[in-house]
């Protein structure tokens, strides 16, 4: 197996008074009861995960389980209490603020649940904005932006302003904006959650086609287990800030490590064929992806 593009080792994020001192006093690994009795909130708890080039890792868990906080620790949008995060072999926790800005600008794409579109810019200008920041000339960035606008189904709304769009349309602009930069590492926090079911399915198809062309490394948060089955190479399930199990979708379905994991994987029908887990018929996500990727299309290349 190739070396991990992103590696997180024993990451912690505790909220409370002097969390670093608290961890030190408890040997760097206090149990959950000790954390709570000490008055701390365990947002991320001794979490380790490696993400390999071209892999889609999906993070699942109930609200408050630590999914979004973990992603923000991985991108250093928030500072971890303890642990190590490596990207392309570089220790991100030792990077300067300016170095992190450049890494996020050129190598990371992000779509979070709540993001701010620029209200004074049109849809086309919003999607092209990160390319403008990169210094790409106007004709190329607008061509790329137009392609992404078409991809997310917003043709005809290039000249609209965010206030003129529905919530779902605004989310699609955010997705297009993130896709425009062709990131090496892509963080997505429920990017399709505001879309209606038909558009959501279409966006999943387009997402897989893009992945077949670009081969990006992706960390994806969703509450939808069917979506996770369809998209993931591996799924990590979180509870109380910790990853309780990580593995291939079929492994989690057939051998859940805990009752909590079983809640996400039991009594599910997925795949267009309607295979049922309780019959032992589990469609492999790779087969679904391969079927979609046969129709992969070329994207406009960008250069400075």
Give the location of each predicted region:
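Short coil-to-helix segment of the ABC ATPase nucleotide-binding domain corresponding to the Q-loop/switch region
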Residues: 121-128
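Conserved ABC ATPase signature
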Residues: 161-165, 169
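ABC ATPase "signature
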Residues: 246-247, 255
